[in-house]
Amino acid sequence: EISECLVGSEMCIRDSNYIYWDDGSSIVIQNGNLQYNTKTELEYSYLGYLYGTMPYLTDETTEKFPETEISGIDKEAAIEQVKSILDEIGVEVSKPRVYSLTYEKLEENTDYSQTDPNGNAPHQWTKEDAAYAIVFKGTIDTLPITEVGYRSGPAAGERIVGIVGKQGLIAFHALNIYELETENELSDEILTTQTVLENIQQKFRNIMITDKVEIEKINLEYVPVLKNVEKGEYELKPMFVCMARQNIEHSTDKEDNGLIGDSSIFPIIFDAQTGMEIQIGGTY
């Protein structure tokens, strides 16, 4: 059913987790992940340009690929195409964010002097290569599931994204998708954002820092917490996911240059009921 929803019914090779078509397209379904890639995505790597080295998207992604109209692609139809797949597999999502991977922006973010490990140069973009990236957040009773998370593996958060170009669907990834088995009532009330800000102030009051940290966003989201390693079970807990930015100045070797600036974006996550901080990269 999923394969027909994505590309139709004709296929080349199929087993329990993989489907391959003779045109180079493939679907991988494994451990809460569904990845559909066409040969175009595998060769051009739209998702690589969208995410870069980050596991999630930030405001810098919006600056890099702002939402604009792309000639020859119906944006609303592109959104509906991706949403229909999510409806088919039963994933509840929030309103999408749209990023425009225009020819100009793809060119701007491509370094043609770089080659991949096989020595291949980047794809030479044309106006026909423009595409929309349609990004959703999974939800439970309208509360979003984090994209950020606090560690590697499924607890890194969900990723739901579709790439739609003039030729149709180029890629669709639904990663770290959770199937609810039970729902429990919250044991405590949700803290206020003011309490969260006070916790952040206390955190950095005890750390000697020379560069100011600014909190750009505070979102109440479900964050997966590992419950049973052997069974691969997670508990989705309400957390405040705070996106912080730190502008760092570095001294240069050249006296006439003085200082140069750099920017770092990182999450700070607090349990929304206890106020306890979740250590990034560690355990709960």
Regions found by a protein language model. Give the residues of each.
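Preferential activation on post-signal-peptide N-terminal prodomains/segments
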Residues: 1-3, 7-10, 14-151
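Generic hydrophobic secondary-structure signal
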Residues: 2-6, 11-13, 164, 218, ...
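A short, surface-exposed beta-strand/turn
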Residues: 28-48, 146-174, 252-284
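Glycine-rich, flexible loop segments associated with nucleotide phosphate handling
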Residues: 67-74, 234-238, 258-266
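Helix N-cap and loop-to-helix transition residues
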Residues: 74, 192-193, 271
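Segments that shape or occlude catalytic/ligand-binding pockets
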Residues: 81-252
